[in-house]
Amino acid sequence: MIRYTVAGHSRRCVVGASKRVGAIKCITVAATKRFISNKPNEVFTKLTNDNDPKRDAFFKYTWGSWLKNDKQEKEKRFTKFSIEGLNRILNDIYIQSNEMAKAPDGKILPPVFNKNLTVSLVNNVVPKNIGKINPNEKVQVTTLSSIHEGKHHRIYKVDTNLNKAFILRIPYPLENENTLSYRIRSEVATMDFADLKLGIKVPKIFCYGVNSLNPVRQPFVLQEFIEGELLMKDWDPLIEDGSSNQKKYDNVIKQVSDFQSKLVSLKLNAFGSIYFNNDLKDGNEKEFVKEDIYDGETNPDLQNRWKIGPSVERCLWRHKSHLDFHKQMKPFLGPWPKKSPMDIIKNTGLLEAENAKTRIAMKEAGSSAELMYPRTLKEQITTYENLAKIAPDLFNVKTKAIPNMQELLSPRLFHPDLDPMNIIVNKEAQEAYLLDFEGACTKPFILQNSPQFIAYDGPKIYDLKEDITDFDKLSEAEKVQYQFMYKRTRNQHQWEKKLNDNNPKLITAVAPPVKLLRSPYIAAVERKTEEEYLLIDESLLQLKEVWDIFAQNELVNQKKFPLNYSKEDIERHVEDLQKLHEKLISTPFAATQGWIPQDMFDQLLNSGSIVKQENGDYTVKQPEATK
């Protein structure tokens, strides 16, 4: 049974090489329960025939369906690649491994840019990581297994005739190659930094390509396969206090918090994202901060290995492929000097405003087919320009009212998906490995949002009996609601308690006033839909109500709230926000933008709960009103 997997999948595909030379066995597995699969069906295809249509099913997206534009969304996630090209790359890294065996022990070499437009991390391509190959022997892919279809990547397990497995990550082509190039280059360098400098256990990366011109014919990352279980298996956010699984609950909090502690342990010298220094040879030197990424490095192999360059935080790149990269995006991506932490917020606002303006211009010119109301885009412009305007005043960076303010403002590494779903515990040593550094960046801890698995913005309940009057007299339905609030509060409190244990100088970042001050920026970072600009407005209006108090305590720079809202502005906002909440409540699967896990989708379709329309979209059949 494959262990490097994610709960909730509905299908798994396998391609295997048969004993017949040059043949590939395609295996498609339909799963009806999590982690449980039926006996697979087998289809054979020639190894060298990259254009065999029998393979297409292996590359198609199968883990979910969309109510709207299902065909188009799945086509965007089609990840066809060259198996023969992958085979060549595997043979190349084993040749490099033999060469690395001659290097002095402990020597850390820089990445090697190969002639086939891939990059090898030769310090990882060593026999202890990938095994040895006999002279004149060739590496052969024996089995390919599709083990995860995530939000951003397709994950394949690659087995070889050397009894050595690898992981191949193929990003979905949801954005242009320039975006994917920056993202992959930074993620690989960041994982290298986390491994070699911070001592964080991550899968070793062996080779990667940033575009489709390499032998794989797709951007890719080839990395170590870790056999084990996801830490999420032990996470139950609604566990009862004193449960028999309490130790598992506590261990999850500890493991994730320990990773965070290592991520933020080193103060860096700029804000942005991490890249390899030798990316400079083909790039623009102005993209990178000239000084060292951090101070005090004594290992000559690590000196000048990494640089800080443009931020690859997802919010800065999402849905911006239509912008002119050099003129409209690059000026807002950093890197930013450590003396200007609030420029991150300012540039986030300016970039999103520029994006909305461009989309309006494209619609007016008739060059955009997107279905978006101009009023929504105009409101976004106002919202993001307000965010940019208030950015310099959100925090008084010289305040004494917030303890250890300079520690909170220092550049530190931020992992946007710090979550039990991204931590795998290996089978043999029971050691935790942190996965998926996509979108990682360096920014002040005071601007880093809490991990999503413990984040909670609702009413806080710390003790059901003390905080809720006559709790025992409530109905069972009311008790369940309050118990849910209590458990979410408890989870967040346990996380913050662990933060205080590990990093006491950073604990004031979770103080309620600090959370409120950064809330407009966090709402911008976490925005998922067009209408959620309203959540940024809501945070700004909440700040308006308490600004005078914050100013009196020297938490902010200006005595007067920097933004102007008329009575009509506020009334319109309240009305629009109410409509958004009603839409989220009344629209099925609104929280997932209409995406439904495939096993659930099939059940709903077969039962008649969802109905296919003539245009290919699906509607959810509303239950008939009871008489």
Swiss-Prot record:
GO terms for cellular component: mitochondrion. The keyword Oxidoreductase does not apply. Disruption phenotype: Increases frequency of mitochondrial genome loss. The keyword Ribosomal protein does not apply. Its main location: mitochondrion. It comes from the Eukaryota. It is found in: Mitochondrion. Residues 1-43 form a transit peptide. InterPro entries: Kinase-like_dom_sf (IPR011009), Mito_inheritance_9 (IPR051035). SUPFAM superfamilies: Protein kinase-like (PK-like) (SSF56112). Keywords: Mitochondrion, Transit peptide. Present with 8200 molecules/cell in log phase SD medium. Belongs to the AIM9 family. This is Altered inheritance of mitochondria protein 9, mitochondrial. It comes from Saccharomyces cerevisiae (strain ATCC 204508 / S288c) (Baker's yeast). The lineage of its organism: Eukaryota, Fungi, Dikarya, Ascomycota, Saccharomycotina.
